[in-house]
Amino acid sequence: MAKQLVFDEAARRSLERGVNAVANAVKVTLGPRGRNVVIEKKFGSPTITKDGVTVAKEVELEDKLENIGAQLLKEVASKTNDITGDGTTTATVLGQAIVKEGLRNVAAGANPLALKRGIEKAVAAAIVEIQNLAVPVEDSDAIKKVAGISANDDQVGEEIASAMDKVGKEGVITIEESKGFDTEVDVVEGMQFDKGFINPYFVTNPEKMEAVLEDAYILINEKKISNLKDLLPVLEKVAQTGRPLLIIAEDVEGEALATLVVNKLRGTLNIAAVKAPGFGDRRKEMLRDIAAVTGGEVVSEDLGHKLENTGMEMLGRAARIRITKDETTIVDGKGEQAQIDARVNAIKGELDTTDSDYAREKLQERLAKLSGGVAVIRVGAATETELKEKKHRYEDALSTARSAVEEGIVAGGGTTLLRIIPAVRKAAEGLQGDEATGARILIRALEEPARQIAVNAGEEGSVIVNAVINSDKPRYGFNAATGEYVDDMVAAGIVDPAKVTRTALQNAASIGALILTTEAIVSDKPEKPQQGGQGGGGMGGGDMGGMDF
């Protein structure tokens, strides 16, 4: 396909028009008084949302050149959302402001590369100041406020804070759709995995169809068990203790399974067998996690172990094990905390290096199971449209709460971005020429989120920005929800995670600076409408008029 090439100012202005198209649709959602955006869906009911990244992802422009600019700004929103789960609208507003102010200076003759360097140096100074202003999150009250602000709903904040209290800050919290109208929080204590009993004869409670083993031993075997001869030595040793036994293996089949069932039915041994969770290398790691939690060892040929030589010291222990047809829960495993901590640290190391969202999700699940619990928030609503929107707000609020725990909180409502302006201005004083101009571009952009929040609340943005900047109080800001000025935004519960503010600024500045230094665009040439389309239709009327298609 033929390409079109556009250069210089024309290229940059095309990108700017695309940036403006996305930003103007997204920024109306910013703040507590932000408006909704209705998104048409080809199938099903329309989506109504106040989530910036959801709006941004739906924007596709007809003009190919403008669409490139739109895609670049969408990248800002998506990347910010991937890292923190919030701050997408702030990042979009910052990106638009940097592009607008920057292109004005480029058109006036400024050196784009010098502007880019100035913006980058100003961002570095801004990030240091954000970290200085951050307050550590030490109680559930702060988490409740952060999550509540993200979702624009105090009830959401309360439920997420409650779930975090129950499972810990590292715990897994999943958001699911409820079949009813009400939202509820369920907490599963202990370590749970999605594999149930291999055979229903292992059930100890027929009414509930579950097997419960109290003060049980746990045999963790990496391979299939089918040969009774290999398993018999362990069974005899456990039988002498009179305690129950849980076998976790790739599978248990043949004469080994038949013997277990017979012994269970006769009452010789209270026993149950479940398949190991996961697949491949992930299964091996999950078995090692279970071993760490229960104080046992994985019987693995890779480690030189054989099932027939397994001693009692290699078996794990747990106070209670509950097994249903779908899942197994191990409560109060007897593993040493040092071993569990070592596994946790190893998983955190993998989390820092992985690029895959799927791998990250699975690592987070393992981390939570080791840390002692899983909470499920089941979101209820009256209609499908409301349910989708509500569930999305819960997911955003949860990500925001995690970000707050990670790097602390700062004053919200765009206040922190205004408060770091003096530090950026000081950094700009050490710069020369167009680099100093680049720093001033960022200073101007830092005002935009607070201005837009005020505009969405029906106030005069510039008046509010000036009032906050000129105040001597370090956390003085404007509460757009009530239309009042507040002496201490953090004390008033109007807060943002420092990580969200930092990430939004970094991503916006990165894309903004790239657009300023763009000198050419190469894109597909628009296709011309085919000639003679009408004539073809006329011809078809003669011979084919009676045919049905």
Curated annotation (Swiss-Prot):
Gene Ontology biological-process annotations: protein refolding
Predominant place of localization: cytoplasm
TM regions (residue ranges): none
Protein keywords: ATP-binding, Chaperone, Cytoplasm, Isomerase, Nucleotide-binding
Region ranges (Disordered): 522-549
Compartments where located: Cytoplasm
Residues annotated for ATP binding in this entry: 29-32, 50, 86-90, 413, 479-481, 496
Record Pfam families: Cpn60_TCP1
An annotated GO cellular component: cytoplasm
Purpose: Together with its co-chaperonin GroES, plays an essential role in assisting protein folding. The GroEL-GroES system forms a nano-cage that allows encapsulation of the non-native substrate proteins and provides a physical environment optimized to promote and accelerate protein folding.
Name this protein carries in UniProt: Chaperonin GroEL
Protein source organism: Deinococcus deserti (strain DSM 17065 / CIP 109153 / LMG 22923 / VCD115)
